[in-house]
Amino acid sequence: MSQTVLAFDFGTNSIGCAVGQSITGTAQGLPAFKAQDGIPNWEQIGKVIAQWQPDLLVVGLPLNMDGTEQPLTQRAKKFANRLNGRFNLPVELQDERLTTVEAKSEIFARGGFKALKKGKVDAISACLILESWFEQQS
């Protein structure tokens, strides 16, 4: 059974978003959400959830390279809990180590410095989070 999944790359100023299907295992970036000190516009997130009707949400979990938690880890977990509480959808956490670095190098390879716009980085990071989640499911 194919699932539609939305993924989020949590940040204090911007939250990347991507949508994907489990049947293809691929993700497509969506516009990033602005956030103020980690608090998103929940109405905008609600509209995206209503539009895509996901079966599941995935939130990137920022960890240090050694696997220990960093200051942003707890905030990402809190964001995941709030998604679950507000939208009554299952939420899973996905290790996101190196996704931002990987996203920046992918964007730079395609378009140089001009292409390194923050929203694009967040969207591609969310795609990488979702695609790595799909890989772990298979």
UniProtKB/Swiss-Prot annotation:
Its EC number is 3.1.-.-. The keyword Hydrolase applies. GO terms for molecular function: nuclease activity. Keywords: Cytoplasm, Hydrolase, Nuclease, Ribosome biogenesis. It is found in: Cytoplasm. Pfam families: RuvX. It is an enzyme of class 3 (hydrolase). InterPro entries: RNaseH-like_sf, YqgF, YqgF/RNaseH-like_dom, YqgF/RNaseH-like_dom_sf. GO terms for biological process: rRNA 5'-end processing. One of its GO terms (cellular component) is cytosol. PANTHER family: POLYNUCLEOTIDYL TRANSFERASE, RIBONUCLEASE H-LIKE SUPERFAMILY PROTEIN (PTHR33317:SF4). Belongs to the YqgF nuclease family. Could be a nuclease involved in processing of the 5'-end of pre-16S rRNA. This is Putative pre-16S rRNA nuclease. It comes from Glaesserella parasuis serovar 5 (strain SH0165).
